[in-house]
A protein has these predicted regions:
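Conserved catalytic core of the tyrosine transesterase superfamily
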Residues: 1-142
């Protein structure tokens, strides 16, 4: 299948995760890969949007669409650690984009890597694991 934005291969995902040099970098890479969130949604994420009981994140995306994103155990770990003494993510979209690019360069991944490529990678992985197309559209807000 040809993609406009080339998703990362499994080995590239592993190398990208290993290249993270701090908790914050690991949070950014893992949450984007595990949820398919837009960079702007991560940058605006607030503690009150997370349902720890239902393992999901409620976000408002493009066009004011409200949607619920399932939260994996890994995402839950990173967000619960981050939000111990914070109420919201304290990074801007541009900063997150720069961090993702820097980690990809450190990992020596040759293809273009951006938060949107991580979102696309999430979608492709979801479908390869047998995920439902309609459910994926709901998660991504399409």
């Amino acid at each position: 299948m040809d993609y406009k934005r080339e998703p990362l291969e499994d080995v590239e995902i592993d190398v990208l995760k290993q290249a993270c040099g701090s908790f914050e970098e690991s949070l950014i890479i893992n949450v984007l890969l595990e949820t398919g969130m837009r960079v702007s949604e991560l940058a605006k994420l607030r503690k009150e949007q997370i349902s720890w009981q239902r393992d999901c994140i409620t976000t408002v995306g493009k066009g004011g669409k409200r949607r619920v994103i399932p939260m994996s155990k890994k995402t839950r770990f990173y967000l619960s650690e981050y939000f111990v003494n914070k109420e919201k993510i304290e990074w801007g979209s541009r900063w997150i984009q720069k961090i993702v690019k820097r980690i990809a360069e450190k990992a020596q991944i040759l293809k273009k890597v951006s938060p949107h490529v991580l979102r696309h990678t999430f979608a492709v992985c979801y479908l390869h694991k047998g995920g439902n197309v309609r459910a994926l559209q709901e998660i991504l807000g399409h």
